């Protein structure tokens, strides 16, 4: 029992130190600002990609519903009108205008990339061509994956609504949207950081983020429907603070999930006695000696694990 409490205290201490170091609330604010600037370009790019694939024509309305439910509670009519105007105006833009919007969208992806890598305290810089290729794949393949997931979720929801007497095994399918959110967060925490992240750590951080994201969405929707005082204060401009607040909360949840995945790796080193919390935190000042010690510690752990596996195989 004492060991459990001691380990829990160590983990919470390390998490709190990381939270203060990473300044997650400020990082979330920065990403919120970047998201608002890149929102129109992203919407334009996403729907342009969908228009190039007729199979996703029926998914367009579902995607709008997804945006309303996740990023614009109680503002669906106004946001829907804006989206239609954005898509209509994008068809009349020149090549230079389209390129500039794509660049802004890529800048948002770059901001997310740098913010997540800062949580893992990785200063490695990818080659420019490699980074551009990754960002472009995210920008083009991302909408297709989102469209596919929304299509599957909509199909399952329709099936469940039509037949309420489905067996329990099939009713579990109603959790597919949650599992898709969990999968997306896991992929983000695994692929985006330059450091190698264990899939178990990514999955745990993503699970916590997905749970808080889902609960937060329901709580936020309940708040804006139960206490509509913001409409009296802001009037026709009420959509803007609603979206700003929800995007801010969403980024806080996503970054906390990323930090949890990062802290799990640090926590493992500390519990094995390979490095102290003070040394681990001090290493993030990028002092070469401490950085080298951390790298050496990780390498030593890998060697010990390999040797232990070899001994077990011989004994077997």
Curated annotation (Swiss-Prot):
Family per UniProt? Belongs to the UPF0761 family.
Which cellular compartments is it found in? Cell inner membrane
Where would one find the signal peptide in this protein? none
Source organism (scientific name): Pasteurella multocida (strain Pm70)
Please give the superkingdom of this protein's source.
Bacteria
Transmembrane segment boundaries? 36-56, 92-112, 128-148, 172-192, 204-224, 236-256
What Pfam families does the entry give?
Virul_fac_BrkB
Give GO cellular component annotations, separated by semicolons.
plasma membrane
Q: Which HAMAP family match?
A: UPF0761
> Sorted alphabetically, which keywords does the UniProt record give?
Cell inner membrane, Cell membrane, Membrane, Transmembrane, Transmembrane helix
Q: How does it sit in the membrane?
A: Multi-pass membrane protein
Major place of residence? membrane
Please identify the protein, giving its name as recorded: UPF0761 membrane protein PM1616
């Amino acid at each position: 029992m004492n060991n459990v409490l001691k380990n829990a205290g160590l983990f919470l201490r390390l998490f709190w130190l990381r939270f203060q170091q990473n300044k997650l609330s400020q990082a979330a604010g920065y990403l919120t600002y970047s998201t608002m600037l890149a929102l129109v370009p992203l919407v334009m790019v996403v729907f342009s990609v969908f228009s190039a694939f007729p199979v996703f024509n029926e998914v367009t309305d579902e995607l709008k519903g997804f945006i309303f439910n996740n990023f614009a509670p109680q503002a669906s009519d106004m946001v829907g009108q804006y989206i239609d105007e954005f898509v209509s105006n994008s068809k009349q833009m020149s090549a230079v205008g389209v390129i500039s919007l794509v660049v802004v969208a890529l800048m948002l992806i770059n901001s997310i990339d740098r913010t997540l890598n800062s949580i893992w305290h990785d200063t490695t810089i990818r080659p420019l061509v490699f980074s551009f290729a990754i960002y472009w794949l995210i920008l083009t393949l991302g909408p297709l994956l989102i469209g596919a997931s929304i299509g599957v979720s909509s199909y399952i929801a329709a099936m469940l609504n039509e037949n309420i007497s489905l067996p329990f095994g099939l009713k579990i399918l109603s959790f597919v949207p949650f599992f898709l959110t969990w999968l997306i967060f896991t992929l983000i925490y695994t692929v985006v950081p330059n450091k190698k992240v264990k899939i178990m750590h990514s999955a745990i951080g993503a699970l916590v983020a997905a749970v808080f994201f889902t609960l937060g969405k329901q709580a936020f929707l309940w708040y804006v429907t139960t206490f509509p005082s913001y409409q009296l204060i802001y009037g026709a401009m009420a959509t803007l603070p609603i979206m700003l607040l929800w995007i801010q909360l969403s980024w806080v949840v996503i970054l906390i999930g990323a930090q949890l995945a990062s802290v799990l790796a640090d926590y493992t080193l500390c519990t094995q006695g390979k490095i102290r919390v003070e040394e681990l935190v001090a290493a993030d000042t990028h002092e070469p000696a401490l950085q080298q010690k951390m790298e050496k510690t990780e390498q030593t752990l890998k060697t010990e694990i390999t040797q232990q596996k070899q001994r077990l195989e011989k004994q077997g």
